A protein has these predicted regions:
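M16 family metallopeptidases and their MPP-like homologs
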Residues: 1-26, 35-84, 98, 102, ...
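Active-site recognition of the HExxH zinc-binding catalytic motif
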Residues: 18-30, 239-240, 248
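Acidic/histidine-enriched alpha-helical segments
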Residues: 37, 41-46, 88-106, 171, ...
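A structural supersecondary motif
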Residues: 50, 219-221, 242-250
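A common structural junction motif
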Residues: 80-89, 182-190
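An aromatic/glycine/proline-enriched structural segment found at the starts
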Residues: 126-134, 159, 163-226, 244
Length: 250
C-alpha cells in the first residue's frame, strides 16, 4: 500500500520567513510521540515499511509504503499517524537541523546548476513567492525560531488542508477507515488560500553569472500554464518530442 498525505504547506506559505515550510516538514519525522528519529526509522524498517517527508514550493508531504498485511500495515499506520499528529518539535533537533540546513545551502551555492536555477526563478517570478528558495537562505534559516515552526504546523497541517492519496490492496471502505485513522485527530482548520497568480513577463531578460566551473549552464524559460489547462498534456508530450525529459549530449 502506498500512501501520500499532501498539505498545501509549501514554500509559498513562508510569509517572509524563507525556509520555514521546509524546516517544518523536515522536523516531522525527527521526533514524534516521544520517539526519536532513529526510533522512527528503526520501527519502519522492522515493519518492512518506508516512511518519508518532503516539501516544495506548493506543498509538503508525508509518504508511507507498507505491506498490506494488517500485521504490518496497522503498526505502520500508527507510526504515520504519530508523525503527522504528534511531532515533538524538540529544540535540540531544531537547532541541529537549522545548522545542517545552513551547511547544505552553502554547499548548494557552490553548484553552478543550483545558482542558475535560483537566478532563473528570481528573474522569472520577481516579487511572487515562487521566486524564493524553498530551503531558504543562510540568513533566513539563522533567523528562524522554533515557535515559528510550531505556529506554521498548527496553521497548515490541518484536515481541510490535506489531500490523501492511496494506491494498493484496499477497497473504498477500508481506505476511508485508513484516512480517519491517520488524520482523524487533526483539527479541521481551514484550507490554505489560493496562491496569487504569476505575473506575465513584460520583456526578455538575460542574466550572466561568472562561476569557476568547467561547464556552462544555461536556463531558458517563462511562466507556462496551469495543470488543469486542456493544452497541458499536448504541450507536455510535445516538449518530450523536442527533447525534454532528460535528453543529454550522449
Amino acid at each position: 500500500v502506498d500512501i501520500n498525505v499532501t498539505f498545501a504547506a509549501g514554500g509559498v506559505r513562508d510569509d517572509g520567513h524563507a525556509g520555514l515550510a521546509h524546516m517544518t516538514s523536515t522536523l516531522l519525522d525527527m521526533g514524534a510521540a516521544g520517539l526519536s528519529a532513529d526510533e522512527i526509522s528503526s520501527r519502519a524498517e522492522s515493519l518492512g515499511a518506508e516512511l518519508g517527508t518532503g516539501s516544495a514550493r506548493d506543498m509538503a508531504w508525508i509518504t508511507l509504503r507498507s505491506l498490506s498485511d494488517p500485521a504490518y500495515l496497522q503498526p505502520a499506520l500508527k507510526l504515520l499517524a504519530d508523525v503527522i499528529n504528534k511531532p515533538d518539535f524538540n529544540e535540540r533537533d531544531f537547532v541541529r537541523e537549522r545548522e545542517r540546513t545552513q551547511v547544505a545551502i552553502r554547499r548548494s551555492e557552490q553548484s553552478p546548476a543550483t545558482v542558475a536555477e535560483y537566478t532563473f526563478f528570481q528573474s522569472t517570478y520577481g516579487d511572487h513567492p515562487y521566486a524564493l528558495r524553498p530551503a531558504g537562505t543562510v540568513d533566513s534559516i539563522a533567523a528562524l525560531q522554533l515557535d515559528q515552526v510550531k505556529a506554521f504546523y498548527r496553521q497548515y497541517y490541518v484536515a481541510r488542508n490535506a489531500v490523501f492519496s492511496i494506491v494498493g490492496d484496499l477497497d473504498r471502505k477500508a481506505a476511508e477507515q485508513l484516512v480517519e485513522q491517520v488524520i482523524g485527530q487533526l483539527p479541521a482548520g481551514k484550507r490554505a488560500p489560493a496562491v496569487a497568480s504569476v505575473p506575465e513577463l513584460t520583456r526578455a531578460q538575460e542574466q550572466r553569472i561568472y562561476h569557476p566551473s568547467t561547464q556552462t549552464h544555461i536556463r531558458m524559460g517563462a511562466p507556462g500554464m496551469h495543470r488543469g489547462d486542456p493544452d497541458y498534456f499536448p504541450l507536455y508530450v510535445g516538449n518530450h518530442v523536442l527533447g525534454g525529459g532528460g535528453l543529454v549530449s550522449h
